[in-house]
Every structure is written in C-alpha cells, then in structure tokens.
Amino acid sequence: MTKVLVTGAGGQLGLELCRQLKQAGYEVIALTKKMMNIADQRSVRHSFGHYQPDIVVNSAAFTSVDQCEKELDKAYLINGIGAYYTALESTRIGAQYVHISTDYVFNGKGTQPYREDDPLDPKTIYGKSKRLGEELIRLTTKDSTIIRTSWVYGHGGSNFVETMLKLAETKQELRVVSDQIGSPTYTKDLAEAVIKLFSHPPGIYHVSNSGICSWYEFATAIMEESGLETAILSVTTEEYGNKTPRPAYSVLSHRAIEEAGIRPRHWREALREYLQERSSACD
C-alpha cells in the first residue's frame, strides 16, 4: 500500500486530502503543526525517517496575508524554509514530493491567465515567502511537483465563503470588492487534482475551479445559492481599504492540468455542492 504523508493535515485542504486519500486506498500519515514543525529540520527529519512515506504532500503554510506582513520571520520560516526542509528530507528518503503554492507569487497586474512558466513577481510578504519556498524546492530537487491554487475554501477552514455566511447572520448588507478577479477553488476539487497528479510527471501545475469572477460576484453567488437576502454592495479596492495589497488579477492558466487530462468544473457548480454539503451537515 502506498504511504502518503500530509503536512498541514489540520487545515481545510489537509483535511480533505486525508479524507480522499483514505477513500482511494492510500495509507495516510496525517501530521498537524502540533505533531511536526516544518520549520524545524530535526522535527521534519525525525518524522520522515520514522514514517518512511512514498509520497509527501506539503499543504502546511502560513496563509494569513495581513499577518504575514506583521510576522515576517514566521512567514519566511514556514512558507520558505519549511518548504525547503520538507523537500530536502523527502529527497533524502526517496519520496515523491508535492508542494502547494499560490497565485500570490505573481504580481496580480496581468490581463491573461497566468501560465505555469510566467515570471514570478510577488508584491506581499505572503507571496514573497511562497516564492522563496518554490525557489528552494527547485534548488533541492528537479523531481518535485508544485501546485499553485487560488481563492481556496472548504470544510473545516476559515475562508471567504464562511466569512460571508457568518457576516450575513447579523448584517443586512455587505461591502465586497468588485475589481479583484480570480477563480475560487473548492478543496474537494483541489484535493482530487492533487491525487491525480501523483501519476503525472513532476513540474508546475495550476489548479483552480474553471470560470472567473470578482469577489463581489462570488459573494453574490454565495447569498443566492444559500437563499439569503443580505445585500452585497460593490466597492473598489481603494474604497474598501485593505491594509495589505491584494492582486487585482489572480486567474491561473489550466494548460498543464488540461494536458494531464484534468478539467476542473465551474466554480459556481463547486460552490453549490459545498453549500449543500454544509447545509446537510448542519441538519
């Protein structure tokens, strides 16, 4: 039985990965941040040496964009050095290595979907720390798989969908930016693609649901699919006043995954399923 070690197993993607891996018949080693500190090489070496996985999926990350600006050391340690240690120790034991990255490694000023080989030009500490992770991985091994994704949401996590639904409980209207464009990604679809890519050549892949929207359109869809009457008001990024800059354009090209035979469903269809599952779980 193929043994897969998942870092960040307590996060929304890690939870879904572990669930699907078990269903697919893999032996799963689910490591949370309390069980292994990816920024501590001795901790990583001990865990990898003890479990001897065939495949490592590094889904551990410090993803709070605003907090990364305040805690630079933590951001670079987890997203940069942690990626290096997990890649290095995977190589040492001969394990296949898969790393989850982000659209934030690009500058967000594009007008066409970002291709896998487009130059990296991050504008935030979060993006810069994730770029460092990618660079260190590529220096460590040529056989890694790096999967960039965007606008991720899923069960058991803190995300945009859950934030909107929580705010809708107490507010009659919500202000949401309409000039930031991207593609939402449901963890169920992301995890499915990650597992499929185990059997494809190493390299860089972009995975998100298909279709594009603004955060305003995404929020409107959340309310419509949930049957809620909370009004969504369109505002610009400048009017909203984020402390940390957000990419205006985050759409990722699916060229590589389509060549691998992976064609993600539309984001609205994925959102509908997520909300239905969420509702059923609450009944």
Swiss-Prot record:
Listed GO MF terms: dTDP-4-dehydrorhamnose reductase activity
Keyword NADP: yes
Record GO biological process: dTDP-rhamnose biosynthetic process; polysaccharide biosynthetic process
One GO CC term on file: cytosol
Keywords carried by this UniProt record: NADP, Oxidoreductase
N-terminal signal peptide: none
InterPro entries: dTDP_dehydrorham_reduct, NAD(P)-bd_dom_sf, RmlD-like-bd
Pathway assigned to this chain's UniProt record: Spore coat biogenesis; spore coat polysaccharide biosynthesis
Family from the record: Belongs to the dTDP-4-dehydrorhamnose reductase family.
Name of the protein: Spore coat polysaccharide biosynthesis protein SpsK
Organism listed in the record: Bacillus subtilis (strain 168)
